[in-house]
Curated annotation (Swiss-Prot):
<dbReference type="InterPro" id="IPR019805">
    <property type="entry name" value="Heat_shock_protein_90_CS"/>
</dbReference>
<dbReference type="GO" id="GO:0051082">
    <property type="term" value="F:unfolded protein binding"/>
</dbReference>
<feature type="region of interest" description="A; substrate-binding">
    <location>
        <begin position="1"/>
        <end position="341"/>
    </location>
</feature>
<comment type="similarity">
    <text>Belongs to the heat shock protein 90 family.</text>
</comment>
<dbReference type="InterPro" id="IPR036890">
    <property type="entry name" value="HATPase_C_sf"/>
</dbReference>
<protein>
    <recommendedName>
        <fullName>Chaperone protein HtpG</fullName>
    </recommendedName>
</protein>
<dbReference type="InterPro" id="IPR037196">
    <property type="entry name" value="HSP90_C"/>
</dbReference>
<keyword id="KW-0963">Cytoplasm</keyword>
<dbReference type="Pfam" id="PF13589">
    <property type="entry name" value="HATPase_c_3"/>
</dbReference>
<keyword id="KW-0346">Stress response</keyword>
<dbReference type="InterPro" id="IPR020575">
    <property type="entry name" value="Hsp90_N"/>
</dbReference>
<dbReference type="InterPro" id="IPR020568">
    <property type="entry name" value="Ribosomal_Su5_D2-typ_SF"/>
</dbReference>
<comment type="function">
    <text>Molecular chaperone. Has ATPase activity.</text>
</comment>
<feature type="region of interest" description="B">
    <location>
        <begin position="342"/>
        <end position="551"/>
    </location>
</feature>
<dbReference type="GO" id="GO:0140662">
    <property type="term" value="F:ATP-dependent protein folding chaperone"/>
</dbReference>
<dbReference type="GO" id="GO:0005524">
    <property type="term" value="F:ATP binding"/>
</dbReference>
<dbReference type="GO" id="GO:0016887">
    <property type="term" value="F:ATP hydrolysis activity"/>
</dbReference>
Length: 625
């Protein structure tokens, strides 16, 4: 028996790998299974050039056994095995990858690829084991060898007995400590869960004896527990199958199996790309909004596989924030991984995949909107807000990608419509896309400022969500048509000459100046209205900050008291206006009373808080008595 030291020169390097490279101890099983899969792959490639070998896939498998009594976890494979020299080279040298060397020497075809590339995965075993024993026999040798190490004081190699070609790895699982329990890695349910999580799509069967309950042979009314060998992994990933082979039910089953949601997917997108970068993806748009979607706890991201092995559960870089509702997975053979295979190097390949996925999602949504509007409306009610946030965020950088996906309720169509639909119906000579804001469609329809615009035949889009107007401010225009709020102080709408005369008369100017003085800075201006028909009063906003935006900003923490510049508009054709003129001429106190009442009434209509509810109540009583 030979005792040797690791060629990486230091015990500290191994400790660093075990304790720092991997973030989760359960990863060790993924690494060992990947190595076993590589060993079988090498056998396959060898058979392509060696006529004396035949590769019958059914003969090749990976076996996992747990021995709780002796605290051992055993893995066996029927792969190519290792010679003594390969044991020294691959297991005696940290960060020496036999699989990487094999890839460089072998032309990889037929859709196979070798998983391993760093030569450190094997050492992940020392995260859970205080001793590792490897017995292996190479296809090139009649002699088997035993490699053994405690991960601290070098390793030993000695001849061993093994009839078949392949490798057996025995992990002597650590004893529990106050901080860590290692018993779980000997539990059947835990081992199965780790295999399903990381290695479900390894191309060779991963077999394990599992406990099953069956009726007794002599008494079917009584059950007994038996050991039964089962294949734990699925092996054939759905994403590598032809789309023509799959039904909607297959995608739904995959969605449920992966626990992407409790609902059914509303839509799936199956992507297979074989170009500058090769990857497969299955993406899902959920039917309903996840309960935590708009909370800080929600994590976006797609599952990321490298050659069928799960690398990341949520790769956030693959999805833009505005498509964060998308679930699914991506599998690629072309990714540059870091040394632990747990994370990606942020390289060109990842960016290319992310860009392509974004394009696929956008294209699918546009197709749904055009061909299945009812389904799209269902999607939009669940996730439309996120698209609007996407328009608003990053200073509108993504508006061109998203503007055609937006829907708003239409005053004339009585349903959700796209901006493209609105523009196609615009009246001849109409220069603006008109919109109104409020808490609900019903309340918006009753707003004073919508009455005249609607009566003149203009379609109005209803904005009922906080983000709507912020998003539109970033859009600014659509198809060269600017957006205009019906509450805007400079609303572009025709008025008759008589109304213009009322507005510009010297007598009215004095009245409005007096009312503005009474309100003492609460409004920027008082004037007659061009948009009121049956309502007496209305508050318009002058400037970039609208009244709806003021409400949203005021509700935020640290709001810095941002307010819209308000203009009080009076309907010159309403009896109230005549009462104001009479009070101006005869009773200054009454004018003050009327002015404050009208201002507070306008605040209430807009859903803004009264500055002094007690005073408002007292003024109402004065009018009544």
């Amino acid at each position: 028996m030979e005792k040797k030291q690791f060629q990486a020169e230091s015990k500290r390097l191994l400790e660093m790998m075990v304790n720092s490279i991997y973030s989760q101890k359960e990863i060790f099983l993924r690494e060992l299974i990947s190595n076993a899969s590589d060993a079988i792959d090498k056998m396959y490639y060898r058979s392509l050039t060696d006529d004396s070998l035949s590769f019958e896939k059914d003969r090749y498998a990976i076996y996992v056994e747990a021995d709780k009594d002796n605290r051992k976890l055993v893995m066996k494979d029927t792969g190519i095995g290792m010679t003594k020299e390969e044991l020294e080279a691959n297991l005696g040298t940290i960060a020496k990858s036999g699989s990487l060397a094999f890839k460089k020497e072998t032309e990889i075809e037929d859709g196979h690829d070798i998983i391993g590339q760093f030569g450190v995965g094997f050492y992940a075993a020392f995260m859970v084991a205080d001793k590792v024993t490897v017995i292996t026999r190479s296809i090139d040798s009649d002699q088997a060898y035993k490699w053994e190490s405690d991960g601290t004081d070098g390793y030993t190699i000695e001849p061993a007995e093994k009839e078949d070609v392949g490798t057996v790895i025995t992990l002597h699982i650590k004893e529990n400590t106050d901080d860590e329990s290692y018993d779980e890695y000997l539990e059947e349910y835990r081992i199965k869960a780790i295999i399903k999580k990381y290695s479900d799509f390894i191309r060779y069967p991963i077999k394990m004896n599992v406990t099953v309950s069956k009726p007794k042979e002599d008494n079917e009314d009584e059950y007994a527990e038996y050991q039964e060998e089962q294949t734990i992994n699925s092996m054939v990933p759905i994403w590598r199958k032809n789309k023509s082979e799959l039904k909607d039910s297959d995608y739904e089953q995959f969605y449920q199996d992966k626990r992407y949601g409790f609902d059914k997917p509303l839509e799936h997108i199956h992507v297979s790309v074989d170009g500058a970068i090769r990857y497969n993806a299955i993406l899902f748009i959920p039917e309903h909004t996840p309960f935590d979607y708009y909370s800080k706890e929600y994590e976006k991201g797609l599952e990321l596989y490298a050659n069928g092995v799960l690398i990341m559960e949520k790769c956030a870089e693959l999805l833009p924030d505005y498509f964060s509702f998308v679930k699914g997975m991506v599998d690629s053979e072309d990714l540059s991984l870091n040394i632990s295979r747990e994370m990606l190097q942020h390289d060109r390949q990842l960016k290319l995949i992310a860009k392509n996925i974004k394009s696929k999602i956008k294209s699918q949504l546009k197709t749904m909107l055009k061909k299945e509007p009812d389904k799209y409306e269902k999607f939009y009610k669940a996730f439309g807000r996120q698209l609007k946030f996407g328009v608003y965020n990053d200073f509108g950088a993504n508006k061109d990608d998203l503007q055609d996906l937006l829907l708003f309720y239409s005053s004339t169509e009585k349903k959700l419509v796209s901006l493209s639909d609105y523009v196609s119906r615009m009246k001849e000579g109409q220069t603006y896309i008109y919109y109104a804001t409020g808490e609900s469609n019903e309340r918006i329809a009753k707003l004073p400022q919508t009455e005249m615009v609607a009566d003149q035949g203009y379609e109005i889009l209803y904005f009922t969500e906080d983000v709507d107007e912020f998003a539109i401010k970033m859009l600014r225009s659509y198809d060269e048509k600017e957006f205009m709020s019906v509450s805007s102080a400079d609303l572009d709408i025709e008025t008759d000459e008589k109304q213009e005369e009322e507005t510009n008369s010297e007598e009215n100017k004095k009245l409005f100046e007096k009312m503005k003085s009474i309100l003492d800075g609460k409004v920027k201006d008082v004037r007659t209205s061009k948009r009121l028909k049956s309502h007496p009063v209305f508050l318009a906003a002058d400037g970039e900050i609208t009244l709806e935006m003021e409400k949203v900003l005021q509700a935020m923490p640290d709001n810095q008291n941002v307010k819209a510049e308000k203009v009080l508009e009076i309907n010159p054709n309403h009896d109230v206006f005549h009462s104001l003129k009479q009070a101006y001429e005869e009773d200054e106190d009454k004018l003050k009373l009327y002015t404050n009442l009208l201002y507070n009434q306008a605040l209430l209509i807009e859903g803004l808080p009264l500055e002094d509810p007690v005073e408002f109540s007292q003024n109402m009583c004065k009018v009544m008595v």
